[in-house]
Amino acid sequence: MAKEDAIEVEGTVVETLPNAMFRVELPNGHRILAHISGKMRMHFIRILPGDKVTVELSPYDLNRGRITYRSKS
């Protein structure tokens, strides 16, 4: 997947799942499955339920994504 093709969207983490997977709720009400990007994993960035995150979605599968950023607040 080329980075230009990715769809970036904001969301809220609803629940934590095993293997660094998260259920993220998007503003339109959809819930997707997302995993942490490699850089966030390397820098030990913790994500908890309730955190606002930026998720990259592939145009081919809109039910799975990659968390690329956790908001400061």
UniProtKB/Swiss-Prot annotation:
Pfam families assigned to the protein according to its UniProt record, in alphabetical order: eIF-1a (PF01176)
Domain annotation S1-like: ranges: 1-72
GO molecular function, one term: rRNA binding
Subcellular location: Cytoplasm
GO CC, alphabetical: cytosol
SMART domains in alphabetical order: S1 (SM00316)
Keywords from the UniProt entry: Cytoplasm, Initiation factor, Protein biosynthesis, RNA-binding, rRNA-binding
PROSITE patterns: S1_IF1_TYPE (PS50832)
Superkingdom of source: Bacteria
Function of the protein: One of the essential components for the initiation of protein synthesis. Stabilizes the binding of IF-2 and IF-3 on the 30S subunit to which N-formylmethionyl-tRNA(fMet) subsequently binds. Helps modulate mRNA selection, yielding the 30S pre-initiation complex (PIC). Upon addition of the 50S ribosomal subunit IF-1, IF-2 and IF-3 are released leaving the mature 70S translation initiation complex.
Family membership: Belongs to the IF-1 family.
UniProt xrefs under HAMAP family: IF_1
Oligomeric and partner information: Component of the 30S ribosomal translation pre-initiation complex which assembles on the 30S ribosome in the order IF-2 and IF-3, IF-1 and N-formylmethionyl-tRNA(fMet); mRNA recruitment can occur at any time during PIC assembly.
Protein name: Translation initiation factor IF-1
